[in-house]
């Protein structure tokens, strides 16, 4: 029987000093035999997805105490990728994932916590906490802050839904007036919560449901809706039950590594492919699997992508559909239900809230449930009132979206497309693979050949796009933006958004060893591995080289002979210390913190995790 970890600091004569300090935090004699649960919050006023979390940690804490545990809250950092976008702030985004994982490990291990509730929401926070949970392998429940309501705006007499990406695209479109840009800007992000499309934050929060580490509705229930409060209340009770099952009954099925097994990772990636999730999820799923010592690789993702259809299209792939619409159609449980009907997921795996995923689907999938409470839960609608307050409205739709032929969520028999929403491409340009979000690619450019326009920074590419130097048919290549080369693997949302602004969203391709925002659409191919800074072929591409992209056949090729590539590689290596670096010095400040990340970062095909030699 495993001993409660916390007893290292709460039991024994020699721990009198530690108990004295615990007492100073409010603990009493009766508390020293209870499980100590870490409430891992990420409140910050910098990020709309986290601005409402301040009081939610204490909400969970009070429920933990009611259930017989001792709750101790701490905070970790949260970077807003949208605010950090387009300048050197983006260098810090991906490295913050490792910092978050480390900070959770530091706090939980230093204080010998027994279990934890992770209150996350945005892009790197959920992945960082997920990595920490699998690294620590103590009972854990995830509950996120929830999605933002979609913006609504009236332009030219027509009401349309919009989000952050629409504001970025409009700002760079010369055909849109300054006044209309202001209207869009003021309407795009109306409430607290993670940005309203199937961007990285919402993708990851949805995947926690498929992994079995969060409650149903975690990925789709709006941050503003009163129904979301139930998830926080239940998380507080559930974590105490999980802790007691593990420490008092020796039940290892309560542990993250037992729940998030290889089969669960396959379920999560199957969901991701079916809903056209952000390409960033590939990085984060690979990183989480690494922390959990799960043998899940790019080859597994490639295998799954060839058999899973697209069952749901959400912004940016479908601009008028947002997370509130996914929720009305039954949320993640409904998508998993359709995948289950098609035999595409493993329904026998445990979750934190049920003995099997199949049991959860039978109760929570609105297409099969007999529970009126479940059906009412998925009627939760946006309030339509700008606010930064959680649980502040209780509006409901008149009816559910149960249409599995033409609705927001489709069946495997009537999918948006038979090919999945993500694909792994390989070829001489990316020997270890690269990723494209096929759900966001127009059918007319699934096969694409064009001349390379080579840039050695995101900034240089943006300047060229806005100066009308990029033409239809070009392949924009942005290199030295990988985990080491950036460092930090910047998101390329501005280049892709500006291509759309210039009317080139369906006429150009973009290939990079950097990554893309979940808000990116178009023929945007990222994570080229090995990256340029590690000797990848992308570092050898020259202006005007022909690049051939074939998504149906999963290939990407630089149309240059092996002999020529060998010659270019030899010439590069001859540069010595200057090899595999940008030819011109870039105007970016790389601090000690960023250099430390770059020194140990692996390429994207390994999840951009750190590799520290023994």
UniProtKB/Swiss-Prot annotation:
Pathway: Amino-acid biosynthesis; L-isoleucine biosynthesis; L-isoleucine from 2-oxobutanoate: step 3/4; Amino-acid biosynthesis; L-valine biosynthesis; L-valine from pyruvate: step 3/4. Binds 1 [2Fe-2S] cluster per subunit. This cluster acts as a Lewis acid cofactor. One of its GO terms (cellular component) is cytosol. InterPro entries: Dihydro-acid_dehy_C (IPR042096), DihydroxyA_deHydtase (IPR004404), DiOHA_6PGluconate_deHydtase_CS (IPR020558), ILV_EDD_C (IPR056740), ILV_EDD_N (IPR000581), IlvD/EDD_N (IPR037237). The modification N6-carboxylysine is found at residue 124. The keyword Endoplasmic reticulum does not apply. It holds the Pfam family ILV_EDD_C. This is Dihydroxy-acid dehydratase 1. The gene is ilvD1.
